Amino acid sequence: MAEKNDYVNRELSWIEFNYRVLSEARDKSTPLFDRLKFLSITASNLDEFYMVRVASLKDMVHAKYAKKDIAGLTAKEQLDKISEKTHQLVDLQYSTYNRSLVPALKQNGLRIVMEHEDLTEDEAAFADEYFHKNVYPVLTPMAFDSSRPFPLIRNKTLNIAALLKKKNEKEAELEFAMVQVPSVIPRIVELPEEKDENGETQRVVILLEEIIERNMQSLFLNYDIVASHPFRIMRNADFSLDEEEAVDLLEEIQKQLKKRQWGEAIRLEIESNVDKQLLKILKKELSISSEDIFQISGPLDLTFLMKMYGLDGFDHLKTPKYTPQPVPELMNEDNIFTNIRKGDILLHHPYQSFDPVVNFVRSAARDPEVLAIKQTLYRVSGNSPIIAALAEAADNGKQVSVLVELKARFDEENNINWAKMLEKAGCHVIYGLVGLKTHSKITLVVRMEEDGIRRYVHLGTGNYNDSTAKLYTDCGILTCDPQIGEDATAVFNMLSGYSEPRAWNKLSVAPLWLRHRFLRMINRETEHARAGREAHIMAKMNSICDKEIISALYDASCAGVKIELIVRGICCLKAGVPGLSENISVRSIVGNFLEHSRIFYFFNDASPEVYMGSADWMPRNLDRRVEILFPVEDENLKEKVIHILKLELEDNVKAHLLQPDGSYEKVDKRGKVLVNSQDQFCEEAIEMAKACQESKDPAVTRIFQPIESSNE
C-alpha cells in the first residue's frame, strides 16, 4: 500500500513543469526569439496558475477545509510551499531576462531601453511627443483621499502608482494616486533606429509604462511626484456554479464572468525598489499578505515578450516556420467519405494538416446525401471554419446538433458567443451536462448511401481549433467502423437526452467506466508479469495525478511490469524508487510544439492494444468530465502510433527525465546520435507527403514544395 510520501503534490509538480519551460528560455542553443516566446509562456502559465489553483487553495483556507491532498499537505501548507517556489521561479525568470536575453538582443540589433532615464536626448523628445499625441488623451489619472475611495483595479491590468505632494506647500501630506496603463495602446513602442558602437543599424524599443512614468508630471500638474512605480495585481478567477439551481446556465456563466474581474486580490507584482510608504498603502487597500507580494527587478508582466517575438525583421533568430503536411491517404481526387470507406485514417497534428478535419465537417455540410452532423466543441478558434461549416449545414437543411461546453476555462465568453451564433443559424445547441464538463472530441456524420445509412466519425485527442492545431501535438482518427458509429450515436444521445446504452462496443466513456477500463488494463499487465510473462505499458498524456491509477502503476512496477510514461506537465507519481517504482520511468518533452496527445499502449501478452483519447490520468478527467477513449485497431495504424511513442522515448534533445527525488534532468546525450522527436516527425511528414506526390507524378521527384495549409 503506497504511503502519502510516495506521491508528489500536484501544485509543486506543476511549478516543476514551468521550470522546464523556463529551461528552454535559458538554453542558449534555442533560437534567441524563441527564448523570448518561452519566457513569455512561463509568465502567462504562472498568471493562470495563480488565478485558478492558488485562488482555489485560498478559498479552501477561508472555508477552513482541513482535508489533505494526495501528498498529505493541507491547503495552508501547500500555499506556503507554493509561495517559496514561485518567488524562486520569478527571480530566475528575471535573471534570465536581464542578464541573458536583453544583452543578447542588443548584440543582435535590438536595444531595449530598460528605464526612461536611459533615453538619449533625441529618444526622449520622440517619446514625449508620442505620449502627448497618442497616450495622454486615453489616460485617466485617479486620486485617493477621504472623498474618493481607493480605485477599483481590474484583474491583470498594469498600473502606475504614485505618491504626490502639493507644490509650494512644505507641510503638505503625501497623497496617493494611480493611472492604468491602457491596454488599447501597444505596450512595445519603437523609437527611431540608431547606430551601435560598430556603426551597425540598431532598432530601439521602450515599454509604454516607462513613457507614462516619464510624463507623470503632466497628469498631476499641481503636485510634485515623490515616487512612482508600476504595479499589477492578480485576482481570484476561479468561480463555482450551482448548476442544479441555475435556471439559465448561459446567463449564469455570463454573470460569473463579470465577477472574475473583481475577485479577491491574490498576487501583487511591483518594482523591487518600491517606496515603502507606497507599498504599505497598496498592501492595506488590496488586503494582500506579504507572501503574495513579488518585488521585481525588471518590467512587470513578461507576457509582452510574445509581442516582441512577433516583431518583423527577426525571422533569422526564430525556428523556421513549419508548414503542416497533407495526409497521404487523402492526396487523391476522391471525396473524404470515399477515402474513409477505404480504411481508417490516422491524423497526426501539427505534423500533418488539420485541413482534413475542417474538410470533413465542410464536406458533410455541402453533401446532399448527409442527413445529420453532431459535434462536441470545447475550445475553438476566433474565426472558426468549423463553426462556419456547422452553420452552413443547418442552413442547408441538415440536422445539426452541437454540444458547446460553456464551462471551458477562460474560453467561456468565446463559447457563449459561438453558442448564440449556432442557435441563430438553426443548430440544436446543448450546453453540456449538469456537474460535468464535456471534454471529449468527437464528430458524427450520418449519411444516406446506396446500401443504407452509414455513420462516419472523427475522434481526437485535441480541440476542434484550427489555430492551436498548428502548435499542439495531437492525434485523431477518421473511421466508418459501424460499431464506433453506434457508440458515437449513443454518446450524443447521452449528451442531449438522458439515455445511456446498456453496453458499449468499442468506446470507453468517462465518467461511466473509463477509470474501471484503465485499471483493468493496468492490472492485466500486473497479472501477466506475476505469471512470468512479458508485460509492458507505454502511456503519453499531459498530467497524471490520480491516486488510484498511480497506486495500480506502483503495484504493476513491483510485479515487474516495464512502465514508460511520457507526461508533459503535472506528475504526482515518483519514478525509479526502489521497492515502489523502480520499473517506472517518466519523461517530459518540452519543445517548439506543445505536447498534447493522449496515447496508451498495453503489451497484453504479445497481443498489443493501443488507445487514444481526450483524458489524462486525473480525477477530474475520469470522474468529472465526459471523456472518450477509442481503440486503434488497424494494424498499420497501430504501428504508426507505437512509432510515435517509441520515438518520443528516444528523444534526447527536448526530453527531461524525472529523478527519484522529484527533480527533472535533461537526458545525457554525450556520445549519442541526437534525437529531437518533434523535428523528426516534421521530417517524416514531409517525406511521406513527398513519396505520395512522387508516386502520382514522377515529374516532381527533383524538387518538392511542401503544400501550404489553407488555414495559413
Residue ranges and their predicted role:
Residues N542:
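Cofactor-pocket helix-loop regions in the catalytic cores of large enzyme subunits
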Residues K562-I566:
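Hydrophobic alpha/beta core scaffold segments
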Residues K547-I550, Y554:
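Glycine/threonine-rich ATP-lid/beta-loop region of ATP-binding domains
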Residues M1-I537, D555, A559, C571-E712:
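N-terminal localization/anchoring segments of enzymes in phospholipid and broader phosphate metabolism
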